[in-house]
Amino acid sequence: MGITIVLGSQWGDEGKGKITDMLSQQATLCCRAAGGHNAGHTIVHENITYDFHILPSGLVSPSCVNLIGAGTVVHVPSFFKELASLEEKGLKDAGKRIFISDRAHVCFDLHSVVDGLEEAKLGGRKVGTTGKGIGPCYSDKAARRGVRIGEIMDEAVFERKLRSLHAGYTARFGELEYDVEEEIGRFKDYRKRLVPYVVDQLAFFKQYKDSPNTLVEGANALMLDLDHGTYPYVTSSSTGLGGAVQALSLNPTSITSVIGVVKAYTTRVGSGPFPSEQLNEYGDKLQSVGREFGVTTGRRRRCGWFDLVLCRYSQAINHYTALNLTKLDILDDFDEIKVAVAYVLPDGTRLTDTYPADADLLEKVKVEYVSLPGWKSNTMGVRKYEDLPANARAYIEYIERELGGVPVKWIGTGPARDHMICRE
């Protein structure tokens, strides 16, 4: 089994969907490792637009079997809604090619209610969550009181555990805008419908042990990782390479490539430090030209220049074997393009390849930039590297050199599926 892992290298929304879609055409197995319906990416396949949240995007490939792994949290209504949407758009057999680990956890509507209450209590220190209940669900998992997908099948156990969760949150917050008995009633239907999808993950992988090409689809990104990201402004799961190996019980020696997906500039949704953010006309231009609105929340993304300090840190943790640089065309109309090359701390310390753990300290750093000349010409839809303007190639090659020679193998030049350069 050869395993390819696709990971976000910044704060998410890098455009992982397109490379995942492309690689899934050769994959026989596609897996989601972590996260839930807080993730979101869009794929345009045969002129049809698909929005993915919890489902693996390998479903667009008719020969690809898909797994939602043990490290995920699954909002069951969203699972069925998303599956129905795919089937309505022509993927009629999608339901026969998707499975869920019985060890994945259930994200309830209760968790979404609690998410909103917890954010409200934080006031001006809000994390900026998607409000989907992901954090409270992972909190319940860590506290050993969560409900696993497999436990839905035992009606008595399921109802006891959900009522216990509800009682615990009611004791903490008071009366909630949530009816536990109503949710229990809905799961009487979901229980029957889930039966064909739920599997023992290890037995599933043994069944597909001869799969020549397995694709692991990362959600969110390294800088949102619970351990390595800009804590506490992170998601609640392990979004890096280590998290994928753990969640899917992967054999590390079978990993053949780790692809880091990086935007040609930087974006972030929600709260938290963002050293290269541009609160000026450059940030506004990146936001408007790049159509930077979240797939899941519709929120406006914060925008800034490409950050080498961040990407060196990301590379050191995820060990990318190749990069996919996306949305190069968004930079077409800039006279000059800046790249963050160092952070200077308040005491004068200069950082180039380490990332402070202290979120408050990150808010205080000064950023050193280099300026590179823009290319002021259209790269939309370019499919050959040699057809790019010289300054666009120079920008890409500068990033390669500064990231220690990790090759930029794929370059996104537009929204369409074939707007991609593949460098051999």
UniProtKB/Swiss-Prot annotation:
Annotated active site: 13 (proton acceptor), 41 (proton donor)
Binding positions for substrate per the UniProt entry: 295-301
Cofactor note: Binds 1 Mg(2+) ion per subunit.
One cellular-component annotation, GO: cytoplasm
SMART domains: Adenylsucc_synt
Alphabetically ordered keywords of this record: Cytoplasm, GTP-binding, Ligase, Magnesium, Metal-binding, Nucleotide-binding, Purine biosynthesis
Binding site for GTP: 12-18, 40-42, 301, 327-329, 412-414
Presence of the UniProt keyword RNA-binding in the record: no
Keyword field contains Cell cycle: no
Cofactor(s) the record lists: Mg(2+)
Cellular compartments annotated: Cytoplasm
Domain of life: Eukaryota
GO biological process, one term: cellular response to cadmium ion
Protein family according to the UniProt entry: Belongs to the adenylosuccinate synthetase family.
Role this protein plays: Plays an important role in the de novo pathway and in the salvage pathway of purine nucleotide biosynthesis. Catalyzes the first committed step in the biosynthesis of AMP from IMP.
Record's protein name: Adenylosuccinate synthetase
Organism of provenance: Neosartorya fischeri (strain ATCC 1020 / DSM 3700 / CBS 544.65 / FGSC A1164 / JCM 1740 / NRRL 181 / WB 181)
